[in-house]
């Protein structure tokens, strides 16, 4: 039996705002900034603190939703996505699920086989987590994990497609199209990972488009060899 690849993409794009999603802490490059310097009781998850939403993040998200031909929801609801991990001090991530910011969009891709329509299932806002640094103790020190919360609370825009992508060429075309849209709108440089999922395979932590396409091609080849 010949199977057809079925791929849906879930993209997390860091928004180019000055402050975090739910507090006034500055958004900085966590790879160079002093650890835990840009943190307040809100993004550190202290009891009794209340979030205040970033208006500019909402405006950026609306730009993207309209550019992707989405239906903007008249009512938005934010929810708590609960999980326990050291880089998420609140014990939950503020995200959207049942009532996202926008739904039912699409983008048109120019491929070798002609134009392809990729449907956008949802566009919603959420916050990033902190960052863990692991020390293996190879130099005789005690193994440990260190937490940097500078990135905790940074605005993220999640863009989810329907499983309409069927080849590596379409995968690359969609990723390039979305990246160009976000950069043209001035809302993101798309530095965050692109995750691809569906019936085929899940790829995570791909900062580079080339890596995403290579992983997609390898997963398809593996599936075909298993089916033969």
Predicted regions and their residues:
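Basic, nucleic-acid-interacting segments
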Residues: 1-228
